[in-house]
Amino acid sequence: MSKNTKVNAAILIIGNEILSGRTQDTNTSTLATWLNSIGVKVNEVRIIPDQEEIIVETLNLLRKSNNYVFTTGGIGPTHDDITAQSVAKAFGLKYELHKEGYKILEAYYQPGEFNEGRQKMIWMPANADLILNPTSGAPGFSVENVFCLPGVPSIMKSMLGGLKNKIVGGDPILSYTCLLYTSPSPR
């Protein structure tokens, strides 16, 4: 893509905790601000539940109509973290242990701490590219134009710097707010 091409993205927030109101989404603002700064216009944001069929359907729709799709949430160690397997299904790829990711997490944790739950975080679509995590070790991943990041805001934000060379944007998108106060004019 040339620098003058208009580049767009969608943000897909995945998590029942967001939809129930238990957790407030701050990732949308962080991602949109960062994307605008590198010349990527956010066209759409969706918040969906931790349900495989909904994730697959939504992801397939968004990845075909946007240059990039960024997901947050659902790549952690718990039973409801199903984003990685859903992405694999959306792309028709195997869901497997990522060998490089395994080495990274094995080195990150103390002996005996790299348990089954933590190992779940390095199961990804086959041939996924890692997105390194300078905060907590567990990497995100990308497949084609889809970038999967964790839902924890501070961790997600810390990983954005590692994406700069993977995202081709346009001119930065600037916005401002203008407040205009008026008083009624006498008739």
What label would you give each PLM region?
Residues 2-8:
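N-terminal amphipathic/basic leader segments beginning at the initiator methionine
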Residues 8-38, 44-45:
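Glycine-rich phosphate/diphosphate-binding loop of Rossmann-like nucleotide-binding domains
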Residues 12-14, 19, 68-73, 147-148:
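Short glycine-rich or small-residue beta-strand-to-loop segments that form or flank ligand, phosphate
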Residues 16-17, 74-77, 153-155:
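Short glycine-rich anion-binding loops that position phosphate/pyrophosphate groups of nucleotides
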Residues 29-82, 89:
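N-terminal small/polar loop signature for handling phosphorylated ligands or for N-terminal nucleophile
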Residues 57, 82-170:
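Proline/glycine-rich low-complexity loops and linkers
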Residues 170-180:
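Short glycine-/aliphatic-rich beta-strand segments at the starts of folded cytosolic domains
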Residues 181-186:
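Conserved small/polar residues in nucleotide/adenosyl-binding loops
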